[in-house]
Amino acid sequence: MKKIAIIGAGVIGSAVAYELAQRGWRTCNIDKLPAAGYGSTSNSCAIVRFSYSTYQGVAMSYEGMHYWTDWENYLGGPEIDESGLIEFRQTGTALIKAPDGHHQKVTPLLEELSIPHEHWDLNRLSERLPILDHGVLGPPSRPEDESFWADSTDDIEGALFTPESGYVSDPQLSSHNLQRAAEAC
């Protein structure tokens, strides 16, 4: 049997351990903290979004969403972890169409990968997220600068909504789920 040491026991280290364990490797995660998912990046799996600026980032995040939506089957069943399994809550996310134009980089990638998305104007954004302030604030300034207190004079353009995105109910538990699944292999 092949053996490997994995540095880190967060969601990435635990996922690597699980994937390798399924392939017959004996894994050992090394982490300075007391349990899986306790590190500074434990929440890095919390929000599942597709608004990255590279093809690879968007493609990987969209593929990853499919693991979250089928988490129980991916891990081998509900009994894999005595603490229970996380839930993926598919709420969708809204990327604000801000002056920096990030949405213009993301839109062609979503289209190329056939990822469902919607362009919301300010009316639609107000219907869906009525509490959201549409004002553009910035550029950044210090509190002692007079412009720091100025009201916004411009509005955002709207939002780019991706209905299949969402969040993981308990990021720390997701690492624990992966740890238990790796141990069960």
Which stretches of residues belong to each language-model region?
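Beta1/beta-strand and adjacent pyrophosphate-binding region of the FAD-binding site
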Residues: 1-12, 28
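Gly/Ala-rich phosphate-binding loop of Rossmann-like dinucleotide-binding domains
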Residues: 17, 21, 181
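Conserved dinucleotide-binding and phosphotransfer motif residues
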Residues: 23, 113, 184-185
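Short beta-to-alpha linker loops that shape the active-site pocket of alpha/beta-hydrolase fold enzymes
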Residues: 33-35, 125, 178
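Short, flexible, mixed-charge acidic loops at enzyme active sites
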Residues: 39-45, 149-153
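Helical element adjacent to the flavin cofactor pocket in flavoenzyme catalytic cores
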Residues: 147-185
